[in-house]
Amino acid sequence: MISIFWTQLASEDLQEVYDYISRDSIQYADRFVDNLFERVDTLEKFPRLGRVVPEFASESLRELIYGNYRLVYEIISETEIHMIRVHHSARLLK
């Protein structure tokens, strides 16, 4: 089974998204994050589910789309994935 690790940057991104959504509704923010984690957990069985990030064209750097967010991750090995960013799709990815 594949282990999924969250980088500090991805964790900070997720916290910012949660904080933003929770200004309107803590309940919706909780649900959003729970559903996001469920989406990420699908990578344990299907690590190549996401598309290659077009800006970088590296086979190991991929993304899942969740709502308006790009969940950018890197396949480190057959047993390890790192979540790199939780990035709003309207913003440029650097």
Per-region residue spans from a language model:
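Basic, Lys/Arg-enriched alpha-helical interface segments
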Residues: 1-60
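Short acidic-hydrophobic surface loop/beta-edge motif
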Residues: 62-64
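Enriched for short, Lys/Arg-rich terminal
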Residues: 66-94
